[in-house]
């Protein structure tokens, strides 16, 4: 990146690792979002070293809950908000709630 050999970075964050996902992930919401925040902080650090914003792409995928798919979407929105609040130095409030999984589907 610092040598100019990389033009942008893709952050691939899959919701299937979340503890409420039907695939049985083991990462709770707080830790899952800390991953997003750590990426955003790293991107800001690299941007400071470059003297310009590092172009980033957030690739949000996965999430296989059949009982409440909106919780999967809300989890992805939480990740976008966590990253954008850090990268763009903003304070968009996150009021989304992730419902606990009601039963195992698989």
Regions from the language model: what does each represent?
Residues 1-106:
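A general "terminal functional-core" signal
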């Amino acid at each position: 990146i610092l040598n100019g050999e990389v033009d942008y970075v893709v952050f691939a964050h899959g919701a299937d690792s979340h503890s409420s996902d039907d695939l049985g992930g083991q990462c709770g919401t707080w830790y899952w979002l800390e991953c997003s925040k750590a990426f955003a902080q790293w991107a800001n650090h690299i941007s400071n070293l470059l003297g310009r914003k590092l172009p980033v792409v957030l690739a949000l995928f996965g999430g296989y809950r059949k009982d409440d798919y909106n919780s999967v979407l809300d989890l992805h929105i939480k990740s976008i908000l966590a990253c954008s609040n850090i990268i763009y130095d903003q304070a968009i409030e996150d009021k989304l709630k992730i419902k606990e999984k009601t039963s195992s589907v698989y």
